[in-house]
Swiss-Prot record:
Keyword vocabulary terms for this entry: DNA damage, DNA repair, DNA replication, Ligase, Magnesium, Manganese, Metal-binding, NAD, Zinc
GO molecular function terms listed in the Swiss-Prot or TrEMBL record: DNA binding; DNA ligase (NAD+) activity; metal ion binding
Swiss-Prot/TrEMBL catalytic activity: NAD(+) + (deoxyribonucleotide)n-3'-hydroxyl + 5'-phospho-(deoxyribonucleotide)m = (deoxyribonucleotide)n+m + AMP + beta-nicotinamide D-nucleotide
Function in brief: DNA ligase that catalyzes the formation of phosphodiester linkages between 5'-phosphoryl and 3'-hydroxyl groups in double-stranded DNA using NAD as a coenzyme and as the energy source for the reaction. It is essential for DNA replication and repair of damaged DNA.
Cofactors required: Mg(2+); Mn(2+)
GO biological process: DNA repair; DNA replication
Segments forming domain BRCT: 587-670
UniProt organism field: Halothermothrix orenii (strain H 168 / OCM 544 / DSM 9562)
SMART domains recorded: BRCT, HhH1, LIGANc
Protein name as catalogued: DNA ligase
Active-site residues (renumbered): 115 (n6-amp-lysine intermediate)
One Pfam entry name: Nlig-Ia
Length: 670
């Protein structure tokens, strides 16, 4: 028989679980925050006095444990495949036709759900207790993030029934919570998150669960992967089971035919603003689980489900000013300064205008009312001017005749749309951007050396170029703002560790125009040291696959410049490794090896050459035409005939978000 204390602890846990469910799942609390806090504090007091009565599923155990060194890998019981994409009504109709053809049946019910813009997670319960939470990873292997999953209040630590079940769902942050989170970060002088999805993904992958607990994460369940109970017959049945077990469940609607599905998808394009969280589309699934088994899956996606992607959201605002930034290669890029406006979950106050030709083509003027849109994490762009709102006060913008950073000459090279500052070695903006590029993740990956520190180092004359970083001492950094001894020590250690980066990363870090990470990797297959590459002739370079005359000329000109040779010599003297290791075993993460990509349409987050470069850097191949041998067709805005060809041949189609997921999965598993 339980003692009085044991019984009180049990009662408290039941009460707390009930009120957590009312508050975090039903959004319908029955008691005040103060009353809830009293219950929690009473339970904490009792468990501290009686530690032998603490159980893993107690509400007090949501946050605990020491920070991890790394996340363990988890192999999923059932692979978590990506969904195919539908971009319009025709794609949805074709999806339904394929299913009817494969099943040869009269009636099929579909279920339509919100596609929440967050991070997928897989939760495993045994006997009703949460034993593991994992990320999707690459779909086959994810990461064990149980300690962080437990901190999410809407994740039940104990289900309402003692069942064995594996659940899939989405970790996300509500719009209001995201705004408050960014306000707190700004007050602390921290960089705000770009959007709720980034914030959720970054939070769930914190090695210290206390940091995850401080973020306002939520969880919605949307599927049952495995269930050791009475057989489920339908997806709707699975969702209702999840609701009965205590989960917050995704909104859904059962539809009798694809016409109803299409209408619901169209309705939510506008209605999504009403939701408290971000969605970037709808998911359509066959309802009957038996039919799903018959349909099966390809190697990449299930045949019984598809994601309908919303078009990029557009909002109206005003151009307050047009400013010019100077990049590391001297390009002068115009940016519109906007009246702040909410677009796709984040406040937009700037938008790229790309170049002078784009400004002229769209006739963008200071004072104009414009439509802006953003997709993913990239800087938004001005789509078009609303000329009907002009009142005559708008000002025509003219590109500067000299560099705004150094006053140097600017030129527009033949065949290019951008103006460039030709003061390569003397322009402070190019110097700063070059150093930022050098320390970036894909280059030398020097953690803790970011824009704020680099600005101080330049301002105080402690560095003039990226090679000078290797001559810094801890004593140089300690007096700087927001540093201190620990931060200074960490920065110096990170700089020292970067001396042994693979040669292809060093070549990329140098900032040679037109030489991305993929081209850098290709170069190291032929040239085993930087000195070998510096001696290469133009004829040798153009003979290499992926290297054309433009890239070859850029490489030759870079190494001809005395200043660049001087900086490289400083790198060598500082002990930076400028050759491949003798055993030839360099850092390799060729996760796209053997995969062929084709691109069509305009991408928002990459130029075509940047996207191509990322594929090549990961061992993949990019071709210009679609065939049965093509693995992926990446589709941007206004795709051409390649998109139709891919659909005809059944080639996997990736929108830009899915393409980013492919790249990110490779990064996470490299």
């Amino acid at each position: 028989m339980a003692s009085k204390v044991e019984q009180e602890i049990r009662d408290l846990r039941e009460k707390i679980r009930y009120h957590e469910y009312r508050y975090y799942v039903l959004d319908d609390p029955e008691i005040s925050d103060a009353e809830f806090d009293e219950l929690i504090q009473r339970l904490i007091d009792l468990e501290e006095k009686h530690p032998g009565l603490v159980t893993p599923d107690s509400p007090t155990q949501r946050v605990g444990g020491e920070p991890l060194d790394k996340f363990d890998k988890v192999e999923h019981r059932v692979p978590m495949l990506s969904l195919g994409n539908a971009f319009n009504e025709g794609d949805l109709t074709n999806f339904a036709r394929r299913i009817y053809r494969l099943l040869d049946t009269g009636k099929i019910d579909f279920v339509v759900e919100h596609k929440i813009d967050g991070l997928s997670a897989i939760l495993t319960y045994q006997g009703g207790r949460l034993i593991r939470g994992a990320t999707r990873g690459n779909g086959v292997v994810g990461e064990d993030v149980t300690a962080n999953i437990k901190t999410i209040p809407s994740v039940p630590l104990r289900l309402k029934k003692d069942v064995d079940i594996e659940v899939r769902g989405e970790v996300y942050i509500k719009k209001d919570d995201f705004s408050k989170l960014n306000e707190r970060r700004l007050k602390k002088g921290e960089e705000p998150f770009a959007n709720p999805r980034n914030a959720a993904a970054g939070s769930i992958r914190q090695l210290d669960p206390r940091l995850a607990a401080a973020r306002p994460l939520s969880f919605i369940a949307y599927d049952v992967v495995a269930y050791e109970g009475e057989g489920l017959q339908t997806h709707v049945g699975a969702l209702e089971l999840l609701r009965e077990l205590g989960f917050k469940v995704n909104w859904y609607r059962k539809c009798d035919d694809i016409t109803e599905v299409v209408n619901i998808c169209k309705d939510w394009v506008d209605k999504r603003e009403e939701l408290p969280f971000e969605i970037d589309g709808m998911v359509i699934k066959v309802n009957e689980l038996g039919l799903r088994e018959q349909l099966g899956a390809t190697a990449k996606s299930p045949r019984w489900a598809i994601a309908y992607k919303f078009p990029a959201q557009q909002k109206t605002t005003v151009v307050k000013d047009i400013i010019i930034s100077v990049g590391r290669t001297g390009a002068l890029t115009p940016t519109a300064v906007l009246e702040p406006v909410e677009v796709d979950g984040s406040t937009v106050s700037r938008a790229t205008l790309h170049n002078e030709d784009e400004i002229r083509r769209k006739d963008v003027r200071i004072g104009d009312h414009v439509l802006v849109q953003k997709a993913g994490d990239v800087i938004p762009e001005v789509v078009k001017v609303i000329k009907s709102k002009r009142d005559g006060s708008e000002q025509i913008f003219h590109m500067p005749e000299t560099c705004p950073a150094c006053g140097g000459e600017v030129v527009r090279e033949e065949g290019e749309a951008v103006l460039r500052c030709v003061n390569v070695t003397g322009c402070p903006a190019q110097r700063r951007e070059g150093i930022l590029h050098f320390v970036s993740r894909n280059a030398m990956n020097i953690d803790g050396v970011g824009p704020a520190l680099i600005d101080q180092l330049l301002e105080k004359g402690l560095i003039e170029d990226y090679a000078d970083l290797y001559y810094l001492k801890k004593e140089d950094l300690i007096p700087l703002e927001r540093m201190g001894e620990k931060s200074a020590t960490n920065a110096i250690e990170a700089i020292r560790a970067s001396k042994d980066r693979p040669l292809f990363r060093v070549i990329f870090a140098l900032g040679i125009r037109h030489v991305g990470l993929g081209v850098a990797r290709v170069l190291t297959e032929k040239y085993r040291s930087l000195s070998d590459l510096m001696r290469a002739s133009g004829e040798e370079l153009v003979a290499i696959d992926e290297i054309g005359p433009t890239i070859a000329r850029s490489i030759i000109e870079f190494f001809k410049e005395p200043h660049n040779r001087e900086v490289i010599n400083k790198l060598k003297e500082a002990g930076v490794r400028l050759e491949e290791k003798e055993n030839g075993k360099e850092e390799q993460n060729l996760y796209l090896s053997g995969k062929t990509f084709v691109f069509t349409g305009k991408l928002d987050g990459f130029t075509r050459s940047e996207a191509r470069d990322k594929v090549i850097a990961a061992g993949g191949k990019v071709t210009s035409s679609v065939s049965r041998k093509t693995d992926y067709v990446v589709v941007g805005d206004s795709p051409g005939s390649k998109y139709d060809k891919a659909r005809e041949l059944g080639v996997t189609i990736l929108d830009e978000d899915k393409f980013k997921e492919v790249l990110k999965a490779g990064d996470n598993n490299g």
